[in-house]
Amino acid sequence: MNQSDFSSSSPYSTRLHGSSSTELVTQPLPPQTRIAFIQSSWHEDIVSRGRAAFLAEMSHHGVASDAIDLFQVPGAFEIPLHAKKLAQSGRYAAVVCCGLVVDGGIYRHDFVAGAVINGLMSVQLETGVPVFSAVLTPLHFHEHETHLLFFTEHFLVKGKEAAQACLQTLASLQKMQALLG
């Protein structure tokens, strides 16, 4: 498959199984579908833009705001444990995570970032619940106006992308479940 096989106006459209045409059908999420969104508190002014963009994109595609539960944790390091508990609860079809890990000069931020991403991957593989990461680790981050503006805008993009990935993955899993029985 190539990238054009997945493109359409709706982020959770999928190709008809067994169809040779390029016709796409939209698979809305079941009404009982719930999604958890976890956000870290560090750099909340920046990270909250990712949450806002995620919620706006989900709303744009018909997902009610009351179908998304919001959770806030102190830092990115706390995200994987919360993601695991939420995924294990059986209440959520997906868990979306948003945070910013920066080099504060005291510890190796790349170790923290690696632990977070590895933890999130483990959660989804162990539980079967998809976990999406908008946990970003910039190579260089300084709290001056240029970086603050750039990352504030970048989280808008990442929040929207997380919503689209979430919708596409849930639709794909729904389709796969129907095919596999």
Region spans (language model):
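Amphipathic, non-transmembrane alpha-helical secondary structure
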Residues: A52, F77-K84, Q88, K160, ...
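C-terminal binding/interaction regions
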Residues: H109-G181
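Structural motif
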Residues: A36, D69, E78, A93-V95, ...
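Glycine-rich phosphate/diphosphate-binding loop of Rossmann-like nucleotide-binding domains
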Residues: V25-V73
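Glycine-rich phosphate-binding loop
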Residues: E78, H82-L120, Q124
